[in-house]
């Protein structure tokens, strides 16, 4: 049995820990927060109609989330159809531009890119479109909101994921997405140590890893670093690395996003409306009761949008703009807004990751290649589901598989040395 340290109890870390624990390995999970889940964070919002679950972090479960669905089934959890589509958003602050127009332009962009293999940035692709500037900007807004980075930085490949433009269904976990990490952590029991901030990680010359936290120092056979991108880039942590890994990390972009939740006086219909100017979208969705929750949800993406909104100093302005955008909804004048700005979360340093041009399968593999006995997991390293809950889970499970292979190799070497003796 190996002794394995897992740094971070987000979905990546918990996925790795779960797979290793099921294989009989001895795992210890260090989590700086007082809860599991990381950027998966469910809470309740009081409304005139009662209290309703909201997602302050990761929200939508989409097509292709096979690993997440398997874990949900394993832990007896279910999904709820939101009744609206993550992919289709009606522009609410443009004149003469409809969702159908954006869909058509997005498909034109993908056709233009088909011969080039989606090389370059999304902005370079947008510059080739013959459409009116206002329509191109609406598509640009769609890209920047969803990737949470600038179109001038993110790879044009991002359009393949966000610009499906088909009204595919979207789901959430019944009772809140937080229920999955809660269940996974509960199954691990005392192996999860909360309030433990990692300060240093060091490979030991003759094998093993030294991990220093606020409270003690521990030695492990292997360690899985499942921390957010901004945290692993923190020079103060001084994680083991290589030149190849550092080069690969340069192609990973830190996304910045914020969420807003407002109570509603009446029960609305499902909806999805985007602000092109503000780089945010709003939605109302069905919950586990089968009815539409009286909550307006909003998500703002990209560093420039967050900076312009100045949410820390002027949070009420976003509320006012959302109210002006959604005149179809009954938002109380004294509505108690709940704003979450992930850039201000010191344990996250931002929302999720996106990829810059030049990212390859080999490059993302480098992000997960172990450095000594230190292994890596996180949504930022996932080639297909970057930035998503599914990507975090897949990455964590891959890390667990690599750790088990390493432990088998070490065990085989030890047996061989004993036989020679």
From Swiss-Prot:
<comment type="similarity">
    <text>Belongs to the flavin monoamine oxidase family.</text>
</comment>
<keyword id="KW-0614">Plasmid</keyword>
<feature type="binding site">
    <location>
        <position position="33"/>
    </location>
    <ligand>
        <name>FAD</name>
    </ligand>
</feature>
<dbReference type="GO" id="GO:0016491">
    <property type="term" value="F:oxidoreductase activity"/>
</dbReference>
<feature type="binding site">
    <location>
        <position position="39"/>
    </location>
    <ligand>
        <name>FAD</name>
    </ligand>
</feature>
<dbReference type="InterPro" id="IPR050281">
    <property type="entry name" value="Flavin_monoamine_oxidase"/>
</dbReference>
<feature type="binding site">
    <location>
        <position position="379"/>
    </location>
    <ligand>
        <name>FAD</name>
    </ligand>
</feature>
<dbReference type="InterPro" id="IPR036188">
    <property type="entry name" value="FAD/NAD-bd_sf"/>
</dbReference>
<comment type="subunit">
    <text>Monomer.</text>
</comment>
<keyword id="KW-0560">Oxidoreductase</keyword>
<feature type="binding site">
    <location>
        <position position="31"/>
    </location>
    <ligand>
        <name>FAD</name>
    </ligand>
</feature>
<dbReference type="Pfam" id="PF01593">
    <property type="entry name" value="Amino_oxidase"/>
</dbReference>
<dbReference type="GO" id="GO:0019608">
    <property type="term" value="P:nicotine catabolic process"/>
</dbReference>
<keyword id="KW-0285">Flavoprotein</keyword>
<dbReference type="InterPro" id="IPR002937">
    <property type="entry name" value="Amino_oxidase"/>
</dbReference>
<comment type="pathway">
    <text>Alkaloid degradation; nicotine degradation.</text>
</comment>
<protein>
    <recommendedName>
        <fullName>4-methylaminobutanoate oxidase (methylamine-forming)</fullName>
        <ecNumber>1.5.3.21</ecNumber>
    </recommendedName>
</protein>
<comment type="function">
    <text>Catalyzes the removal of methylamine from 4-methylaminobutanoate with the formation of succinate semialdehyde. Is involved in the catabolism of 4-methylaminobutanoate produced from nicotine. Has a very weak monoamine oxidase activity with 4-aminobutanoate. Cannot use spermidine, spermine, sarcosine, dimethylglycine, glycine, choline, betaine, alpha-methylamino isobutyrate, methylamine propionitrile and methylamino propylamine as substrate.</text>
</comment>
